[in-house]
């Protein structure tokens, strides 16, 4: 669907594919045999490097044990940049690779998806493919996506997100490319790989899951096949995120979040997203903050904004989050907002963007080191100019047309301003 089509009613719904997947403890050990089945011979492995863990080393050594040649690109940054993608494409072409493996969270997977699309088009700039199904060659190199976080679900979706730093260097633009040709060939979700994920990152990724689940549940697309997965993912997140954050070495919480992220991604894959993601994209474009952190801060404000047009859906979400709604009207039962705020506070996430500093998220996941962009990250200002430019970015985001409530500059600007400067308790009064 094109963005202009999304602005109209949705008479025709579209179901988008997701890949074959291996899920569960130990699944990552299957990468060698699975790669051989898919015809891999010389593989470009794309990752952030996952500093502080030996995951990449173990997986690449396993691949070599099975006779595969490995070329490593480990400079993917958080909010992957167009130059990350194009540097990887150059490395792929120079080494005559025939396949891709991405190891990490959404940044590694998204950069890899963009690289695959570029390679299939003889190395064209990845920014040429912003939009909906802009690729012209449906055949691209095979790709195994190995997740080390429970967050984006990028390993199973048809979307990838890239930051365009070249079109207007003074105003970087983070965009979503939706492309059926970008879907991974095989997804591997193994909760054992999550053990090395820092606690703060675990919490923030969990709110990415909650955003992925809640937005399609109230989306204007109202896509019936997504609703069951969305509600189940909300329930799993409410039941498991505290455990995964407070007891990170305990398997049950990690495994619960693995399933939550996987089915939440299947929900939004066809059910759409909204301005939680639009706000997140805008803030990370200008400040390079972590996507999950941005979603966590935006989520309560956007829920409050959307609730008046979807009380019944929010009542369902409240029940899924453990609120006793027996005997209440839908308006009374729509207490999911309070449940979300309690969860955010329980797992220790900053409550507004002006509380965020460079110490608010794990730097070992931010591509520190040889980077062209990280130096631009700074403390968020949150002044009128900041709110205006972020609001304008939100209105141009591909996720905005699916939002439950219609969005204009006048209606969205107060939401953005509250994300920047507001007190969460104001939403409960």
Swiss-Prot record:
Activity modulation: Inhibited by azide and hydrazine.
CDD domains: LPO (cd08176)
Assembly information from the UniProt record: Homodecamer.
UniProt temperature dependence: The MNO activity increases with temperature up to 55 degrees Celsius.
Known EC number: 1.1.99.37
Pfam families, alphabetized: ADH_Fe_C, Fe-ADH
GO biological process entries: methanol oxidation
Protein name in UniProt: Methanol:N,N-dimethyl-4-nitrosoaniline oxidoreductase
Inducing or repressing factors: By methanol and ethanol.
Signal peptide start-end: none
Catalytic activity: methanol + A = formaldehyde + AH2
Keyword Secreted part of the UniProt annotation: no
Loss of function: phenotype: Cells lacking this gene are unable to grow methanol, ethanol, propan-1-ol and butan-1-ol, but are still able to grow on formaldehyde.
NCBIfam families: NDMA_methanol
GO molecular function, one term: alcohol dehydrogenase (NAD+) activity
pH dependence remark: Optimum pH is between 4.5 and 5.
Protein family: Belongs to the iron-containing alcohol dehydrogenase family.
Domain of life: Bacteria
UniProt KW keywords: Magnesium, Methanol utilization, NADP, Oxidoreductase, Zinc
Enzyme class label: oxidoreductase
Cofactor(s) needed: Mg(2+); Zn(2+); NADPH
Role, per record: Catalyzes the oxidation of methanol to yield formaldehyde. While the in vivo electron acceptor is not known, N,N-dimethyl-4-nitrosoaniline (NDMA) can serve this function in vitro and is reduced to 4-(hydroxylamino)-N,N-dimethylaniline. It can also use various other primary alcohols, polyols and formaldehyde. In addition, MNO is able to produce methylformate from methanol plus formaldehyde, and possesses a formaldehyde dismutase and a NADH-dependent formaldehyde reductase activity.
């Amino acid at each position: 669907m094109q963005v202009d089509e999304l602005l109209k009613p949705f008479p025709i719904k579209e179901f988008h594919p997701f890949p074959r997947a291996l899920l569960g403890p130990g699944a990552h050990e299957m990468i060698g045999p699975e790669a051989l089945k898919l015809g891999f011979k010389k593989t470009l492995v794309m990752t952030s490097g996952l500093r502080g863990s030996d995951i990449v080393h173990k997986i690449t050594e396993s691949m070599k044990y099975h006779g595969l040649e490995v070329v490593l690109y480990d400079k993917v940054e958080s909010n992957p940049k167009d130059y990350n993608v194009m540097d990887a494409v150059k490395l792929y072409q120079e080494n005559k690779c025939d396949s891709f493996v991405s190891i990490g969270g959404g940044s590694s997977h998204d950069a890899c998806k963009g690289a695959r699309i570029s390679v299939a088009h003889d190395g064209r700039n990845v920014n040429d493919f912003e939009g909906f199904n802009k690729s012209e060659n449906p055949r691209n190199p095979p790709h195994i996506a190995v997740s080390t976080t429970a967050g984006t679900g990028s390993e199973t979706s048809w979307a990838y997100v890239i930051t365009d730093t070249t079109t207007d260097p003074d105003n970087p633009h983070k965009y979503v490319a939706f492309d059926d040709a970008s879907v991974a060939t095989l997804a591997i979700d193994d909760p054992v790989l999550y053990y090395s994920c820092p606690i703060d990152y675990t919490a923030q990724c969990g709110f990415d899951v909650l955003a992925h689940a809640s937005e399609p549940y109230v989306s204007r697309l109202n896509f019936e096949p997504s609703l069951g997965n969305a509600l189940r993912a909300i329930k799993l997140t409410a039941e498991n995120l505290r455990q995964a954050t407070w007891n990170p070495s305990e398997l049950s919480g990690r495994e619960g979040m693995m399933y939550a992220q996987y089915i939440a991604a299947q929900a939004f894959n066809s059910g759409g997203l909204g301005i939680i993601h639009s706000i997140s994209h805008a803030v990370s474009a200008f400040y390079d903050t972590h996507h999950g952190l941005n979603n966590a801060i935006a989520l309560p404000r956007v829920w409050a904004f959307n609730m008046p047009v979807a009380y019944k859906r929010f009542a369902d979400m409240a029940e899924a989050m453990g609120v006793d709604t027996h005997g209440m009207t839908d308006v009374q039962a729509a207490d999911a907002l309070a449940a979300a705020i309690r969860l955010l506070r329980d797992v220790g996430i900053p409550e507004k963007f002006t509380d965020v500093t460079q110490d608010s998220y794990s730097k070992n996941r931010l591509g520190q080191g040889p980077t062209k962009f990280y130096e631009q990250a700074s403390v968020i200002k949150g002044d009128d100019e900041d709110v205006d430019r972020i609001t304008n970015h939100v209105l141009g985001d591909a996720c905005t047309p699916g939002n439950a409530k219609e969005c204009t500059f006048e209606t969205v600007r107060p939401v953005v301003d509250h994300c920047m400067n507001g007190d969460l308790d104001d939403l409960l009064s």
